[in-house]
Amino acid sequence: MEQGTIRLKTGLAEMLKGGVIMDVTTPEQAKIAEEAGACAVMALERVPADIRAAGGVARMADPTIVKKIMEVATIPVMAKARIGHFVEARILESMGVDYIDESEVLTPADDKYHIDKRDFTVPFVCGCRNLGEALRRIAEGAAMIRTKGEPGTGNVVEAVRHCRQVMDEVRMLCALPEAEVPNFAKEMGAPLELCLLVRKEGRLPVVNFAAGGIATPADAAMMMHLGCDGVFVGSGIFKSGDPAKRARAIVQAVTNYKDFALLAEISRDLGEPMVGIEISTIPSGERMQERGW
């Protein structure tokens, strides 16, 4: 890829539509994800549930781990950089990862600026809780957006909240007279030209995936019904009783989200799901979704 134009980068992200992206920490997990039908894997040192449990500062994964996963995977490999840490992102780009996630799962490195993603060849994915956050990230060069949800909880409620918030605000924008769009853009803290584009297209100008707390095939199918283009699954697979079977079931659920009889069938005997966390028990300052601006 010689030139990382936004058209080219968003085109690469479009290729993942209708798919499932799975967090993996070892080459063995990467093969399980690939055999289950994942469209890409996210290479990590620790899944979000373990990052949450360990506390402290979470940084970019050791390049050795990322490289080992890249060596065995024949599907695209993503990796996470800290919010604002453009050097971590440059390191990952130099290694040849297919996508970089500027992620709130890791401890932010800059409390004022996100990475300027326009100057990179590699496409970026970023999280959002609302339309304003989504459009600010797109203005910075993000080629793909996902809900933030609340990672590492196995609780889908925040992903649902963020998805509905974005969709509601898109509908609100589309219903506005054009003369009122500049004020809407100002209130959102989003570029006017992107607001006008969303109003014209009736959706975000990039692929929009669900992420944060998805643990079951039913969770994944619900996010597709809400209008997402695909699903990220973090801790929900490899923190469960039968990762290979659950991974296959979630891929099938995303592909066949309208077939409720099939959803019932693939949801049988998946082993123990990951232990979930009720969001209200997480103190406000410890919620990963609050990272970023």
From Swiss-Prot:
Keyword Lyase: yes
Keyword Nucleotide-binding assigned: no
Gene3D superfamilies recorded: Aldolase class I
Domain of life: Bacteria
Active site: 80
Catalytic activity reported: aldehydo-D-ribose 5-phosphate + D-glyceraldehyde 3-phosphate + L-glutamine = pyridoxal 5'-phosphate + L-glutamate + phosphate + 3 H2O + H(+)
EC numbers for this chain: 4.3.3.6
GO MF annotations in UniProt: pyridoxal 5'-phosphate synthase (glutamine hydrolysing) activity
InterPro entries linked: Aldolase_TIM, PdxS/SNZ, PdxS/SNZ_N, RibuloseP-bd_barrel
One record GO biological process: pyridoxal phosphate biosynthetic process
Cited function: Catalyzes the formation of pyridoxal 5'-phosphate from ribose 5-phosphate (RBP), glyceraldehyde 3-phosphate (G3P) and ammonia. The ammonia is provided by the PdxT subunit. Can also use ribulose 5-phosphate and dihydroxyacetone phosphate as substrates, resulting from enzyme-catalyzed isomerization of RBP and G3P, respectively.
Protein name according to UniProt: Pyridoxal 5'-phosphate synthase subunit PdxS
Organism: Desulfovibrio desulfuricans (strain ATCC 27774 / DSM 6949 / MB)
